[in-house]
Design a protein with these regions (language model features):
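Juxtamembrane/interface motifs at transmembrane-helix termini
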Residues: 69-70, 185-186, 229
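Short alpha-helical interdomain "coupling" segment at the junction between an upstream regulatory sensor module
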Residues: 177-194
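Helix-turn-helix DNA-binding segment
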Residues: 190-229
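Regulatory input/activation interfaces that engage signals or partners
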Residues: 2-9, 13-25, 29, 33-143, ...
């Protein structure tokens, strides 16, 4: 089990990937959009997005499977049994001091590293998942978010190249997940063009991040221009 701060990346992001990620903001298909977008660069089985507020309330839950609905059913059990209270990434984020600005990490663990038997069985062993790689976000408000990608026993283990790909997309995924939480809270009902509503849910600073990424800037160049941590 390991976690590390996200270093700015020199890898340019595909505009198609960026657009597909952003298009999921404020819709019931957030994790599905994340999964489809990342499939262009990273073979994975499931994607989940979990956000827990400062009060401990689950605020965002989205899940998607490459096939079937196993991730969705597993996420329902995660909610019902409050496995966020056993989730090592959520516990780690919850134990940290609140930052002045949003902080991001990449986290990784294998199912066999989990202590809680019920959590390990329900979310890993019983559904054939070996490991999870996550983009972790801690906001000044206390909200903590994990955007996670899972590999099954039939897939190769996550390696350095996979972590590099996740890291290069981490800012995009984290900003989109944060914007989604606000969109759901606002309960917008306006129907607009495919990207108009999701983009309107982003703060001005987040819109600047997305604009830089869509223009072909790398995450590192974007961070340098905007002094992102």
């Amino acid at each position: 089990m390991k976690r590390w701060r996200i270093a700015p990346s020199d890898t340019p992001l595909s505009p198609a990937v960026v657009a597909h990620v952003v298009a999921g903001v404020g819709t019931p298909h957030l994790a599905a959009n994340f999964l489809e977008a990342m499939h262009r660069v990273l073979p994975v089985t499931f994607c989940t997005v979990f956000a827990v507020g400062a009060s401990g309330r689950l605020e965002t839950v989205s899940a998607a499977s490459s096939y079937g609905d196993t991730a969705e059913r597993t996420a329902s059990r995660y909610i019902a049994e409050r496995f966020d209270r056993c989730d090592p990434h959520m516990l780690w984020l919850g134990a940290r001091a609140l930052p002045a600005t949003s902080q991001r990490w990449v986290g990784h663990h294998r199912g066999d590293e989990l202590i809680d038997d019920a959590y390990r069985a329900a979310c890993y062993g019983d559904v054939g998942i070996r490991e999870r790689a996550s983009v972790l976000l801690l906001q000044p408000s206390g909200q903590r978010t994990a955007v996670s990608f899972y590999r099954s026993l039939a897939q190769p283990e996550f390696g350095d190249e996979d972590f590099a790909r996740i890291q290069s997309h981490a800012v995009l995924l984290a900003e989109a997940a944060a914007a989604h939480g606000r969109a759901i809270a606002a309960a917008q009902t306006t129907v607009e063009a495919p990207l108009a509503l999701p983009l309107r849910m982003l703060t001005k600073r987040e819109q600047e991040v997305i604009t830089h990424l869509l223009s072909g800037c790398t995450a590192k160049q974007t961070a340098q221009r905007m002094a992102l941590s």
